């Protein structure tokens, strides 16, 4: 499975490693992803999602139901 947040769509970015001599080599900045189980009370079931830690902050703030509804509206979540 790819390194993409299922709720926000965040994925790896590309940048440079820069040495002291200012030599640049390509590198990847991966999203900070966590595989996490959430309980959906309205569906009375558990779902496992691969989410970034910024999405976890949104879930703590808004609740899992609201965040999943937003992700489906934006087209990130097909479940």
Curated annotation (Swiss-Prot):
GO biological process per UniProt: translation
Presence of the UniProt keyword Ribonucleoprotein in the record: yes
Keywords noted in UniProt: Ribonucleoprotein, Ribosomal protein
Keyword Cell inner membrane: no
Gene Ontology CC terms, in alphabetical order: ribonucleoprotein complex; ribosome
Record InterPro entries: Bacterial_rp_bL28, Ribosomal_bL28, Ribosomal_bL28/bL31-like_sf, Ribosomal_bL28_bact-type, Ribosomal_bL28_sf
Molecular functions (GO terms): structural constituent of ribosome
PANTHER family per record: 50S RIBOSOMAL PROTEIN L28 (PTHR39080), LARGE RIBOSOMAL SUBUNIT PROTEIN BL28A (PTHR39080:SF1)
Family: Belongs to the bacterial ribosomal protein bL28 family.
Protein name: Large ribosomal subunit protein bL28
Lineage, highest ranks first: Bacteria, Pseudomonadati, Bacteroidota, Flavobacteriia, Flavobacteriales
């Amino acid at each position: 499975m790819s390194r993409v947040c299922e709720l926000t769509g965040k994925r790896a970015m590309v940048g440079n490693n820069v040495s002291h001599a200012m030599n640049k080599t390509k590198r990847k900045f991966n999203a900070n992803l966590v595989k996490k189980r959430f309980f959906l009370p309205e569906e009375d079931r558990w779902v496992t999602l691969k989410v970034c830690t910024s999405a976890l902050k949104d879930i703590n703030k808004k609740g899992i139901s609201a965040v999943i509804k937003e992700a489906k509206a934006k087209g990130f979540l097909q479940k």
